[in-house]
Structures are given as structure tokens and as C-alpha cells.
């Protein structure tokens, strides 16, 4: 059975893992306020969806 000839260094291990990252998918800017929101969801900041006021934010 094959055995590694040398121990993998921390730098080598870190360089190999540079592509193991999470990507944030489905984020768009709100057309009303410009804040980032999930696609096909109501904007949590202003309450707009598809150009319409769905949830009115009252103080």
C-alpha cells in the first residue's frame, strides 16, 4: 500500500484548500432601495417585491 514520502506542510495544505469556499448565490440589489436581498423574496429593508409595496414598514 502506498504511503506518503513526506508530511504535507501547512502551506501546501492551505494552497490546496483555497478553492474550497462557499459562494453566496441568489443575491440581488433591491430595485426600490438598493439593499441586497435574496432573489424572489421580499426585501427585508423596505418590504417591496416586484416593484410593489408588499409589506409596509411602519415605525
Curated annotation (Swiss-Prot):
What is an example of a Pfam family matching this protein?
A: Ribosomal_L32p
A molecular function (GO) held by this record is:
structural constituent of ribosome
Identify one Gene Ontology CC term for this UniProt entry: large ribosomal subunit
Keyword Transcription regulation found: no
Taxonomically, which superkingdom? Answer: Bacteria
Annotated GO biological processes are: translation
Keywords (alphabetical) are: Ribonucleoprotein, Ribosomal protein
> Family per UniProt?
Belongs to the bacterial ribosomal protein bL32 family.
What is the protein name given in its UniProt record? Large ribosomal subunit protein bL32C
Q: Which organism is it from?
A: Enterococcus faecalis (strain ATCC 700802 / V583)
Amino acid at each position: 500500500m502506498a504511503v506518503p514520502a513526506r508530511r504535507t506542510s501547512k502551506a501546501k495544505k492551505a494552497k490546496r484548500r483555497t478553492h474550497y469556499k462557499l459562494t453566496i448565490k441568489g443575491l440581488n440589489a433591491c430595485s426600490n432601495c438598493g439593499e441586497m436581498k435574496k432573489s424572489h423574496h421580499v426585501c427585508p429593508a423596505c418590504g417591496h417585491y416586484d416593484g410593489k409595496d408588499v409589506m409596509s414598514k411602519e415605525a
